[in-house]
Design a protein with these regions (language model features):
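A hydrophobic C-terminal alpha-helical subdomain
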Residues: 185-258
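Oxidoreductase cofactor-interface core, primarily capturing Rossmann-like NAD(P)-dependent enzymes
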Residues: 3-22, 26-31, 39-41, 71-74, ...
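Short, conserved SAM-binding segment of the class I
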Residues: 63, 67, 101
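Short glycine-/small-residue-rich Rossmann-like dinucleotide-binding loops
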Residues: 20, 38, 59, 81, ...
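Active-site beta-alpha turn of Rossmann-fold NAD(P)-dependent dehydrogenases/reductases
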Residues: 58, 77-80, 113-115
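Short, amphipathic alpha-helical "lid/cap" segments that border enzyme active or binding sites
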Residues: 45, 65, 147-155, 221-228, ...
Length: 258
């Protein structure tokens, strides 16, 4: 999603910095790469100097918030996940704590919660489809969304005024995992029998109850099938960049005269 944010902001004529822990090749003349570590705080003061908006797409938050305060309180835009306050999953508790830290920081802020990315669902299905029979958790429902839709929305929020909690951003359709699995198998050309299994526990119960859905906020435009077919037509595995997509880097927009 971070790459989409960068592309959208540069297309809008903004000067963009990309923060990473190591030097990266320059991908465009409009983008400046800076070195810093949001986990330790190293390099953040220099990276944030002169920045008026931060789009934060990774999970460590404490050091970034502290550095942002020292930098003059830029607008902090954070991408989070729909349902983190409804599903008792450890990682979601961490995300919720990050949201609270941002909201209580005194910084101008905007938080956008999005439903699960197509990449993550495709990666999950790839793992499940490796054995000759797919043991598929039954009753789970997702509303997968494309990173392009979310990235473009984040860029628009970054260009606007801070609004606190933005309306949730969901994919175009809420689907069962069984439906998504059959679409995945059809596109990648695999034949696998599906054996439904019911997983116990509050996490899976919450997902079955729709805890990860935002049906009233179906703002995404790219369906899971469109995503899969695009990847297949391009000769790419639909899940290839899934993990990389979930480990993006924070992006910073410098002050510009408008």
């Amino acid at each position: 999603v971070g790459r989409i944010v960068v592309d959208s902001l540069t297309a809008a004529g903004e000067e963009v910095r990309v923060l990473s822990r190591g030097r990266r090749p320059q991908q465009a003349t409009e983008v400046r790469h800076v070195v810093g570590d949001v986990q330790t705080g190293d390099g953040l003061d220099a990276a944030l100097d002169g920045v008026d908006t931060i789009v934060h797409c990774v999970y460590p938050t404490e050091q970034l918030v502290a550095a942002a305060k020292r930098a003059g309180s830029p607008h902090l835009v954070y991408v989070s996940i729909v349902g983190i306050d409804r599903i008792p999953f450890v990682f979601y508790r961490m995300m919720l704590a990050n949201e609270r830290a941002i909201a209580e920081s005194g910084l101008p802020w905007t938080v956008l919660r999005a439903t699960q990315f197509h990449d993550l669902i495709a990666f999950l299905l790839r793992m499940l489809a490796k054995p000759p029979v797919i043991a598929l958790p039954s009753g789970l429902r997702f509303q997968p969304v494309d990173v392009r839709d979310v990235g473009e929305r984040l860029a628009r929020l970054a260009l606007g005024e801070p609004i606190g909690r933005a309306p949730d951003f969901g994919g175009p359709q809420a689907r069962t995992l069984d439906e998504l699995a059959r679409s995945y198998l059809a596109v990648v050309g695999k034949r696998r029998p599906i054996a439904p299994i019911r997983l116990p526990g509050k996490v899976f119960g919450g997902i079955r109850a729709g805890g990860l859905l935002a049906p009233e906020r179906a703002a995404g435009t790219i369906t899971f099938e469109q995503y899969l077919n695009e990847q297949h037509t391009a000769g790419q595995r639909p899940y290839r960049d899934a993990i990389r997509a979930y480990l993006p880097l924070p992006h910073h927009r410098r002050k510009t005269s408008r």
